[in-house]
Structure formats: C-alpha cells, structure tokens
C-alpha cells in the first residue's frame, strides 16, 4: 500500500469517531515514496488533525505545541510538546536519530516563555517523540522498574542532551515514545 493510504487507514477509526488527534513521525514513516512534509500534508488533510509541521527553521517535521485550555477561562492549563526525533543517525555515528540542538534550543525558549506567561510557574507538560532517549536505558539498568522489557531500548548511540534540557526547562512531567514495539 502507498504511505498516504496507510496513514488514512491507521487513523480511520479515530476520524470515524470524530476524536481530535495528533501524531509524531517514526523512523520508518518516510522510508517509502513520501517525505515527512508530504506525510504531514496527508495528516493535515484528515478531519480533526491537530498535527502541525512546526517551524521551518527547525530540524525535522512535526515540532509543535498543543496547548490544553482550562474550561473555565480558556487559559493554558497544560501543554504537549511533539518533536521529530529524526529517523537514522549519520553514517559516521550509526544507529537511530535524536533530538537536534536547534530543537532543544526551541524547546527551552518555549518553556521559558510559557513559564513567564504563567506568572513564573511552569505549566504541567508531557513530551511526545518517537525514538527513546539514552536515559531510558539508564533508568531500566540502574533503578527499580516494574513491567516487562522484552527487547533492548533502541535509542541513539549519541546523547544529544535533551533529557538535561528537559530537567533545565523544569516543566516536563513525562516523555512518551513509540519506537520499541
């Protein structure tokens, strides 16, 4: 099947129920005939899509923010960061992609601006991207974890410092990835 049809088929149950939705790209998404920009256009053509291509000057496609509004006063009550963790590393590095320095700087700018707009307090934030951070391995290997791990954490061989930036930003309560399946 062509990539556009696959996207439409995957999202169809959500669209049929008229549920607002958003997505981040995975490392396999643009391995076919369509680029990430093309796939973003497919996403945005579907009903109730909240995905955005994001700033043109940032690495990747699909770096965007979804603000969650308070029902009482329309103030931003929480925030979702969606980031493109790329596909694969450069040939010299090998392995999987990572959040790039310009994306990290963008996140920190956005976190600082949101904190300032919220009276100096951070908003509660969740971050979504595809490829896990190297720190996922460290947590599993060095700390008490519950659950099952039936394969290795497939993270980049390079640590871009995004986890440290999340700590510096002080707003992200959790990160969610989909790479290991």
Name each model feature, range by range.
Residues 2, 8, 168:
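Functionally engaged cysteine thiol sites
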Residues 16, 79-81, 93-181:
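His/acidic metal-ligating clusters that form di-metal
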């Amino acid at each position: 099947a062509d990539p556009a049809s696959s996207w439409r088929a995957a999202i169809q149950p959500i669209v049929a129920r008229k549920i607002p939705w958003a997505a981040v790209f995975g490392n396999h998404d643009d391995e076919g005939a369509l680029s990430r920009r093309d796939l973003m256009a497919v996403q945005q053509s579907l009903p109730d899509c909240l995905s955005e291509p994001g700033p043109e000057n940032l690495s990747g496609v699909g770096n965007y923010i979804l603000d969650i509004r308070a029902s009482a006063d329309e103030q931003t009550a929480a925030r979702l960061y969606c980031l493109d963790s790329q596909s694969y590393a450069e040939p010299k590095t090998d392995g999987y992609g990572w959040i790039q320095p310009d994306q990290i700087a963008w996140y920190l700018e956005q976190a600082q601006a949101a904190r300032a707009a919220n009276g100096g307090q951070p908003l509660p934030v969740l971050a979504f991207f595809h490829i896990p951070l190297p720190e996922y391995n460290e947590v599993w290997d060095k700390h008490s974890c519950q659950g099952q791990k039936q394969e290795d954490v497939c993270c980049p061989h390079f640590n871009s410092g995004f986890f440290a930036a999340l700590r510096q930003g002080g707003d992200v309560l959790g990160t969610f990835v989909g790479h290991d399946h």
